[in-house]
Amino acid sequence: MTIMRKSHPVMKIVNHAFIDLPTPPNISGWWNFGSLLGLCLILQILTGLFLAMHYTSDTLTAFSSVTHICRDVNYGWLIRYMHANGASLFFICLYIHIGRGIYYGSYLYKETWNIGILLLFLTMATAFVGYVLPWGQMSFWGATVITNLLSAIPYIGQDLVEWIWGGFSVDKATLTRFFAFHFILPFIITALAMVHLLFLHETGSNNPLGIPSDCGKVPFHPYYTTKDFLGAVLLLTLFMTLVLFFPDKLGDPDNYSPANPLNTPPHIKPEWYFLFAYAILRSIPNKLGGVCALVFSILVLALLPYLHTSKQRSLSFRPLSQTLFWALVSDLIILTWIGGQPVEPPYIIIGQVASILYFSIILIFMPIAGLIENKMLKW
């Protein structure tokens, strides 16, 4: 008699994906972040569902409904802060996951990588529309500034902005549709994540050495289920520490004031996880140029498979490329800091230099470093 998990139509899919999946024996803790992203997504969908039961997407009552959730709903404050900080946790895992993909050359699985980039875009869109929902000052002005960027598109820009707004300014229609988008997008992300996994399991996982590991693969369960469980426990411990002790650490105090179209906050800025892209946007004086740079700052990831010049896949044995990788990480941290600063000297020039460096490292220095390393190894 066949084991049920190997014969049942549904169980068979789960079995091939999470139990009998052949996995490289040497993948490190950096490979944990894929499963942690799945955990974050489930957490966000569940907390979001409970928040949606009490939230009203109307300009007059949105802010009060969030206050009502925190004050009157049983554990509403916990659900609200878990959802708000869960977004930050999601992006921390996402950026580490992408960083690991760049470091170990996982981008050479083109289909998996491209779906990953699409997932990143959708996650950013979801986080942006979600930030508008509490209808605080930063919600309103963030929505106004970011949607206004579309007006830089020639010919159709202004019409496109008004179409998204559902009027001539950010108002009730905008809030209602943003709530609809924020509700549906996580389910689209879940479906795409499954496709992401499907393509990954076609090729099998990469490993730190960047070499084929078919001869020594081990089953996913119990080795990596245990490892993922440990990662999840550590992550949830850090997460709950943040939620219960420092719930407002990553938020903006301005969002505790109800939206007021007549009063502009002194510094309009997005959440911390968008600051690097916001800094790149601001570093170009031209509006259309800034928008193009903003989009390309993420889209540049799609070029990585075509810019790979090294004969080795991973950066594990390539000190020159490793130095450039960590320079890129440092550059992104600097851009994140600059994005939160006012537009005045010396921040303007630092932002411009950091933006140029960001694109230069990816498009110029890393491909050249790969060629130099090939020469040094006489390949």
Curated annotation (Swiss-Prot):
GO terms for biological process: mitochondrial electron transport, ubiquinol to cytochrome c. Keywords: Electron transport, Heme, Iron, Membrane, Metal-binding, Mitochondrion, Mitochondrion inner membrane, Respiratory chain, Transmembrane, Transmembrane helix, Transport, Ubiquinone. CDD domains: cytochrome_b_C, Cytochrome_b_N. Binds 2 heme b groups non-covalently. GO terms for molecular function: metal ion binding; ubiquinol-cytochrome-c reductase activity. Its main location: mitochondrion. GO terms for cellular component: mitochondrial inner membrane; respiratory chain complex III. A ubiquinone binds at H201. InterPro entries: Cyt_b/b6_C, Cyt_b/b6_C_sf, Cyt_b/b6_N, Cytb/b6-like_sf, Cytochrome_b, Cytochrome_b_C_euk/bac, Cytochrome_b_N_euk/bac, Di-haem_cyt_TM. Heme b b562 binds at H83, H182. The chain crosses the membrane at residues 33-53, 77-98, 113-133, 178-198, 226-246, 288-308, 320-340, 347-367. It is found in: Mitochondrion inner membrane. Its cofactor is heme b. Heme b b566 binds at H97, H196. It is a multi-pass membrane protein. Pfam families: Cytochrom_B_C, Cytochrome_B. The cytochrome bc1 complex contains 11 subunits: 3 respiratory subunits (MT-CYB, CYC1 and UQCRFS1), 2 core proteins (UQCRC1 and UQCRC2) and 6 low-molecular weight proteins (UQCRH/QCR6, UQCRB/QCR7, UQCRQ/QCR8, UQCR10/QCR9, UQCR11/QCR10 and a cleavage product of UQCRFS1). This cytochrome bc1 complex then forms a dimer. Component of the ubiquinol-cytochrome c reductase complex (complex III or cytochrome b-c1 complex) that is part of the mitochondrial respiratory chain. The b-c1 complex mediates electron transfer from ubiquinol to cytochrome c. Contributes to the generation of a proton gradient across the mitochondrial membrane that is then used for ATP synthesis. Heme 1 (or BL or b562) is low-potential and absorbs at about 562 nm, and heme 2 (or BH or b566) is high-potential and absorbs at about 566 nm. Belongs to the cytochrome b family. This is Cytochrome b. It comes from Cratogeomys fumosus.
